[in-house]
Amino acid sequence: MRRRRYLRDRAEAAAAAAAGGGEGLQRSRDWLYESYYCMSQQHPLIVFLLLIVMGACLALLAVFFALGLEVEDHVAFLITVPTALAIFFAIFILVCIESVFKKLLRVFSLVIWICLVAMGYLFMCFGGTVSAWDQVSFFLFIIFVVYTMLPFNMRDAIIASILTSSSHTIVLSVYLSATPGAKEHLFWQILANVIIFICGNLAGAYHKHLMELALQQTYRDTCNCIKSRIKLEFEKRQQERLLLSLLPAHIAMEMKAEIIQRLQGPKAGQMENTNNFHNLYVKRHTNVSILYADIVGFTRLASDCSPGELVHMLNELFGKFDQIAKENECMRIKILGDCYYCVSGLPISLPNHAKNCVKMGLDMCEAIKKVRDATGVDINMRVGVHSGNVLCGVIGLQKWQYDVWSHDVTLANHMEAGGVPGRVHISSVTLEHLNGAYKVEEGDGEIRDPYLKQHLVKTYFVINPKGERRSPQHLFRPRHTLDGAKMRASVRMTRYLESWGAAKPFAHLHHRDSMTTENGKISTTDVPMGQHNFQNRTLRTKSQKKRFEEELNERMIQAIDGINAQKQWLKSEDIQRISLLFYNKNIEKEYRATALPAFKYYVTCACLIFLCIFIVQILVLPKTSILGFSFGAAFLSLIFILFVCFAGQLLQCSKKASTSLMWLLKSSGIIANRPWPRISLTIVTTAIILTMAVFNMFFLSNSEETTLPTANTSNANVSVPDNQASILHARNLFFLPYFIYSCILGLISCSVFLRVNYELKMLIMMVALVGYNTILLHTHAHVLDAYSQVLFQRPGIWKDLKTMGSVSLSIFFITLLVLGRQSEYYCRLDFLWKNKFKKEREEIETMENLNRVLLENVLPAHVAEHFLARSLKNEELYHQSYDCVCVMFASIPDFKEFYTESDVNKEGLECLRLLNEIIADFDDLLSKPKFSGVEKIKTIGSTYMAATGLSAIPSQEHAQEPERQYMHIGTMVEFAYALVGKLDAINKHSFNDFKLRVGINHGPVIAGVIGAQKPQYDIWGNTVNVASRMDSTGVLDKIQVTEETSLILQTLGYTCTCRGIINVKGKGDLKTYFVNTEMSRSLSQSNLAS
């Protein structure tokens, strides 16, 4: 908790800095990376280093007492090692307190480095004669861990390492130059030391650089994965909001599952639907009440409105009705022009459903009355309510709209049509459910509606309880109404309705709520949506950027909070704690097969270490033919391996590469992309370097070995200090320690293969350690013992070559093992993050596609783009005026007779299944390229409404040639023909004889989106009304059009037959035409289309 509090405090400071702009954001990201680096690398590595150093101190003490050395002769050693152990243990305790570690990071690094350097000088100065090779391995260890394990940055690590190596070189050079004795090899030894230190610096810097690059990549992948999760959560939230804004929850999730299955395709693994029918998302509900309401006088008012005023008025009115519906536990079903209908008792049955609908109707009448009183506009509300059973759900494949069907729904519609403006007209069934809650009076609906008379429906008017109290608005008309009498009625309406403040359609797409929800989860409503052409955009405001940064910081803090020094040793859901293998075998196989383009650089670094070993041995070893031949053969082998690895790049750079050398290009590609060639080359490369580190040790001349006193010689002979001959011979074998240093460099060469299998490197180093210890402690032990005993009277542990070599190799082996494991763990972690990121991106794409399908299922694509791409400041309602749109109504009148409710057809469900098939087949036509310009608007019962000409930019309509300007009208006629063909095919399979009746008209329309809850795209205007009348007054199996439309069709090559003058409700007498179904057209249209 302390660490989390600390991280959160830092996050708040970073967020405050982020508010300052781009520089602040960069500081915030830098701080997050530093925290991530600190907890994932610096903290665990410094802990491991302290453990290694403390373990080494304990091992030295154990070896000291195991060898039975005299305490009096090694007082300095016994003081130095326990003191260092105590200091390192104290630092270890403090480092384990993470808050202290974070604050004193640099101090701990400096103290550890100083302690190690001090230990090296103490070992050098106390314990016997100082030699040119003294403590080179220990100082090499310091140099290497300064880069790889101490939490220094690269600059500080270079400075500390240079100080370490140069101080050792300078001290030894000055001290030995002033000491009497043989100095003929001093220069070469010091130069060899310098080469060893340079190699240690290069290997350490290389290791640090690659590890930092790998960690930066892991950090980026972590951030990307977290961002993708944020985005995925957002997409899921977004699609749920979209889906629930279109459909009720009880049916939305079922449809969502099918869409996802369809988007994912066969790979998702679900069984394909073997049913010949489309899925039907319709359910039966009993005991519900249906309300139909129509705004009387709105058609006349709308004729004087501008597009913006019309859409604004409808949105405000229906937004108010939605609010009233919510208050009265009603669900709005659909908006049909200026008609509004809803149901109470869905999806959960409600005992007060009739009371809810009646109260809803009274509230609607009251709302309209307030509008009429406030504006003086003559509009009113006619409401009809009936109670019964319904089938509710969604039919078709596109432009889903939740709807209800049943005889009771039809009756409710006629209750509205047979009602009176300003009154709520109810049936006797609804009256029974009211249980006396309202006073009623005779409705006499059968007088005004023949359907009610035919079905002997007894109707009533509900008496409004508020009717006896006249509102103040009725008594005193507002001043602005009287003053504004000269204003157009639409202007007065618009100004008044603005005070209602109805929510805008799809406002939730850009809803700016808090980043954290009540359950503690982080909200993601401000993350940009998607990667599609209309979704690929940046965060739009500074506040959004700030919130997104805060959320990302919070998630990163959670990730960092879960990282500690012991995490990789504890149980993980993905990675085994000992072997570091993935539990998932497929992921393990995929990780092993990962391409490794950097492998050639690993080989290059290993070859540079080999070069350093060669230079060191050339400087100090006797120049023999075996030395030359052995290193020459090794050089040729490594150069060949290096050439094969770089062959691809070399041949790509060369313009005149021979085709015979293409196998080299393929070979380098195989090495980079396949694991087994890499493993083979790793084994060969490291085997050559490790072997050459000690190879020439087996070819020491006999004279160099026999002139030395052996272990069998009496102690008296070997311990005489004035044995000048023995000392002279011993000094001639000054190169022996450099074999040990070469072995250490050989082990380091194994560690440079960072991304190669950890277990392979461990096995190679283990084999090398066993082999080296066998040489040092067995095969060549007598040479090393004799050398040490001749050079030193009572050699200490760090002066005795055999002990020093074995301990040094073991310490380096453990250090490299820890580094290798750490590297492997984070490489695997990085791969895991990438793998999760990839999967989450695929899931995000599915969610984005789902959102797109959902939104384009209710809106045309260009309208969906408007809502997704708009700026937050653009809160205007969407509306668009078009001069030439072709509108079609295609109905199946016979379906009303076909629809029956009985036990045989599951109370009408099977009838709706057939209607679903018909509408779905009609919708299938929309996916054909030639009908891409056809926009389905809605279905009304068994009537299919569509339009063309809505996709064109209105400003471009007049710029087109007349023929092209009206081509979409021809497309609509073609679509009507296709509908007839589809219906004929269904008739053959279902043994029915349904006929299509089509009405088409063209002209100006207003398009817009209204309704915050269940937003709906619709078109309005006289063109739409006339098209509807062309259908309702039409003839089965005929396409009826107006005279103006017939003239356009004839110019496009269609033939039309005059029907004559017919009376159209609300329009008077109109001359109409039938489009000939023989489709006798000239070739002119096909030429235009081409």
Curated annotation (Swiss-Prot):
Q: Which GO terms describe its cellular component?
A: cytoplasm; dendrite; membrane; membrane raft; plasma membrane; protein-containing complex
How this chain sits in the membrane, per its record, is: Multi-pass membrane protein
How the protein is activated or inhibited is described as: Activated by forskolin. Is not activated by calmodulin. Inhibited by calcium ions, already at micromolar concentration. Activated by the G protein alpha subunit GNAS. Activated by the G protein beta and gamma subunit complex. Phosphorylation by RAF1 results in its activation. Phosphorylation by PKC activates the enzyme.
- Which reaction does this enzyme catalyse, per its entry? ATP = 3',5'-cyclic AMP + diphosphate
Q: Which ranges does the record mark as transmembrane?
A: 45-65, 75-95, 107-127, 132-152, 157-177, 186-206, 601-621, 626-646, 679-699, 734-754, 763-783, 800-820
| Native source organism of the sequence | Rattus norvegicus
Protein name listed in UniProt: Adenylate cyclase type 2
Q: Identify the keywords attached in UniProt to this record, alphabetized.
A: ATP-binding, cAMP biosynthesis, Cell membrane, Cytoplasm, Glycoprotein, Lyase, Magnesium, Manganese, Membrane, Metal-binding, Nucleotide-binding, Phosphoprotein, Repeat, Transmembrane, Transmembrane helix
Q: Which residues carry this modification: Phosphoserine?
A: S490, S543
